[in-house]
Amino acid sequence: VPFYASDIVHTGGNYMTDGLGIAASTDIVYVENSIPDEDVHSIRQEYYGIETYHVVDDPNNTYIDHIDCWGKYLSTKKVLIREVPDSHPQYDEIEETADYFANSLNAWGEPWELYRVWTPGNQPYTNSLILNEKILVPVTGGSWDDEALAVYEEALPGYDVIGFTGSWESTDALHCRVKGIPDLQMLQIFHNPLNNGTEPDTNGYVVEVLFDDLSQTGLIEDSIKVFWKNPDSDNWDSNILYQSISSQEPDLWTGS
């Protein structure tokens, strides 16, 4: 397996990405590196494929300045930012940061869907881990735990949202302490989400899908389909997806 070392220092708790070329950190990433700020961005692009790198001031204004203490990309189109009462000393900074991410664009050029989680006592609810079909959320035994879990359930229906107690702090919780074990042979699938603002063309709704066959065992072409159904229907329909003929996009498949 080829090994590449990039000349950059980075802490895992200060990095989040959508997996489609967009990432975010606080500006402590500049402080931790002795290279020019623009070189930090260049390395993220050249080594990690990050085309849009949001580097922002830390709204919490704590000693650690890690992004997982106040925010999290939940999916390729949803972002979670903590929320505090207007009496909180960092209220203005946190709201400014929430507005910033709500007005930035996802990989499909659409505004991010913003979700908020109530943290009046600096609860570490954003310091969670999404692992396969589960979301592991640090809880404190306080009165806002159930509401925090409900936010995750609303944002990511179908996931098993589980609260975990522990010796959590506002600057040190679950995401800070665990690591995911990657499946190096997995099949990654990315597609453009359809929503109420998506307009159909003459052949219906166009779906674009990127397949990343990490195992390199090959795709079964006649099994690559898009499935859908209407709310009033019990049966699923399907159409074949077709591979792009462009040599620049060999992993792109489209259909409608």
Regions found by a protein language model. Name each.
Residues V1-Q188:
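The feature marks the mature, well-folded catalytic cores of soluble enzymes
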